[in-house]
Amino acid sequence: MNRLGSVWVVVVAVMVASLCIPHPSWGEAQARRDANGEGPASQHALIGGVQASPATQVAQATQATQQDPSGEAIFKRICATCHSSLKPGDTGSAVPGIRALPRELLTQFSPDAILNTLTNGKMQAQAASLTAAERRAVAVYASGRDFGPTIAAPEDVETNLCTEQLVMGDPGASPSWNGWGNGPANTRFQPKAQGKLTAADLPRLQLKWAFGYSNVMTARPQPTVVGGRLFAPSENGHVYALNPHTGCRYWTYKARAGIPTAAVVGRYRDAAGNQGLAVYFGDRKANAYAVDAQTGREIWVRKVDAHAAAAITGSLAFDGTRVFVPVQGLNEEGMGGFAGYPCCTFRGSVSALDANTGTVIWKTYTIGENSPRLPSQDGTASFGPAGGGVWSVPTIDSKRHLVYIATGNGYADPPQATTDAVLALDVDTGAVKWERQLTPGDDWSLGCQQSNGANSACPAMLGPDFHLSAPPVLTHVGDRDLLVLPQKSGLAWALDPAQEGAALWQYRFGLGSGLGGQWGVAVDNDHVYVGVADLLTPTPGGMRALTVADGTLVWQQPPFAKLCGAAPGCSAGQGGPLTAIPGAVLNGSMDGGLRAYSTNDGSLLWTFDTNRDFDAVNGVKAHGGSMDAAGPVVVDGMVYVASGSGGLVGRQGNVLLAFGLP
C-alpha cells in the first residue's frame, strides 16, 4: 500500500445537506440502525434475465399511524434549514446561492424515490442517524403522499423483457462506446466507423425509445454500449442490460447502493473457469463490482474503502487485467464547520483490483495520513490532512506504464501538494511518479468562514474550491503527447506527461467558481471542445473550441436562450461532458437541451428539448430535466443520453433517451 507524504449538483446537494443536519458519529448512527434490526445495507441480487431468481419479495408496509415517527418534525429538524418553504414571489431555491429544492418542489417526487435517495443515494449520509421508520416518515412528508398499503417492487424490474436472449457479439467486431470516455485515454471522441453518424445526419435524428428509471430523483449515470448490448446503471442501484435498438431488457442486477456513473466492459476468467465479458462499476458506498455481461451473474464484489464518507462517483478504468477504482469523500467535505463532528479523516484514493477476482493489488492514497490537531472550540477532536478525493475515471497511458488521476480539494489543514492536482501512478505498484498541482492551498469545507482560528476543524484560510472534477484526457499533436483537462477555476490546461506534468498551455474559458467548468471536455485530432458552466454567475453557458497544440481559441458560441424558461432550477450552464464525432460536437445543457454544434465554426446543427414527459418502453412514468453529469453516447448510428441529472442545483428527471435515423 502506497502513501504519498504530502459542484456542482452533487457537491451542493450533499454538502449543503451535511451542514444542515445534526450528525451523530458514524459509529453511533450504525449502532442505532443495528438496535432497530436494520444492520448494514448488503442486498444484492440478479433480477430477471436468463438466470433470473424467483419473483422479488415485496416488503409489507402499513399506513402511518399516530405512533409512527413524525415526518414533519424530522424534516424540520434535519432538512428545513436548506429545504425550507418558498416565500411569496419566490420561484426557485429555498436558500439563495445554494439552490436546494424547497419543500414545495419536493412533492414532484414519489415517496419511493425520496426513500431511495435517503437509503442508497446521495443523501444516505445525511440520513445516517435515522431509523428505517424515520426515513419512511420523511419520505411521506416530503413527497406529500403515502406509500399506500404495500411498497411495490420497482416497476421497471419485472417488465419489458426481451423475447430473445441473444448472445453478445465480439466487442472488437461491433461498434461500441466503452466506459465513460470511450476508451482508456478518455477523449470522448467517436470515429465514424464506430459512431456511424456524420454531422449531416444529426438534423434527421428522431427519438426511437425512452427508458424510465423508477424510484430515483436523478438520471446521472451514462450508458455503455458493447457487443450489441447497452448497460445502463441507475441511482436506484440497478444495472439494466438493454437491447440498444429497442430498449427491451435482458437482465437487471441489483447492487448494494446507488450507481452514479458509467460502467466499463472487459474480459474476465474466474477461479471456476467461467469466462466472458464482465461489466465493471462502482456505487455510492465504495463497493466495486464485476457482473457477467451476458447473464447478469455476479462475479465479485469488493469494498475498496471502509470510511463512512467514501463513495465511487468516477467510472472504473480497465487495462486488460486490472480495474482502477477512484474514491472520493464528498459526504465529509461539508462537515468542517459543523460543531461536534471530529473533522476530517477521509483521504482520496485509487485502488487497482484484479479484474478476474476483485483482489486488491495496490491502493494509493492521494494525501498523507491524518494526525490529531488542536481540538475545536467545543472540545471536539479534529484531524488533518483530509480530502483529495478522486471524482473522475482514471486515464491509462500504456506507453509510459502510468495511470493518471485528477484530485479534489483538501478538507482540513495542513495543505497538501497533491490536492487540485494531476498524479501519475505506476500501473503495477501504484507508486506516485510525479504530481502537478494546479491550485495550491485549496482546503475548503462548507460552513467554514473565510478565516478561521487555530482551534477550529475548518482550514485556517478557505481555498476557492477549484478541485478537478474531470479526468485528464490523453491526446497528442504529432509525436508529442498531452494531458488536457478543465478545472472549476474556469481554466483549461494542457500538461506534458513526458516532463512530469509541466504546463504546456492554459486558456480561460469561464469565470470559474465552486460550480465552474465541471465534468469533462472532448478532444478530436485538432481541437479541444469545452462547455462553460459558470452556474453561480449571471451569464452561465456557452461553448469554446481550442487548438490542441497551443490552446488558441478557434471559435466560441454564446449560450442560447434557455429552453426551460423561468422554471425553478433552470440554467443555461453547460458543464456536462461533451462528445465529439467527425464534424460535430454534442452537449447536454442544464436547460434540458441536447445540442449538436459544427466543429468548424460552432454553428448549431440540431437541438432536442428533453423538458417533457416520455412514454417509456418499460412503463415507468418518465420525464426529462437538466443534463450535467452524464454526456451523450454515440454508437452504431444511435445517440443515447440520460436526462435529469440536475441534482439539487438543476431540475431532476429519470429518463434514458435513444435517438436514431428514420
Model regions: which residues?
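Short, solvent-exposed loop/turn elements at domain surfaces
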Residues: 90-91, 184-191, 215-221, 240
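Periplasmic/extracellular electron-transfer cofactor-ligation site
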Residues: 68, 72-108, 145-150
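Asp/Glu-centered strand-loop micro-motifs enriched in Gly/Pro and often flanked by an aromatic residue
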Residues: 67, 191-226, 230-231, 253
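Electrostatic cytochrome c docking/interface patches
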Residues: 32, 39, 43-74, 89-90, ...
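Blade/loop signatures of beta-propeller domains
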Residues: 157-208, 366, 370-371
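Bacterial N-terminal signal peptides
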Residues: 9-20
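Extracytoplasmic/lumenal domain signature
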Residues: 199-214, 239-259, 265-275, 280-310, ...
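Extracytoplasmic electron-transfer domains, predominantly the class I c-type cytochrome c fold
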Residues: 96-146, 177, 402
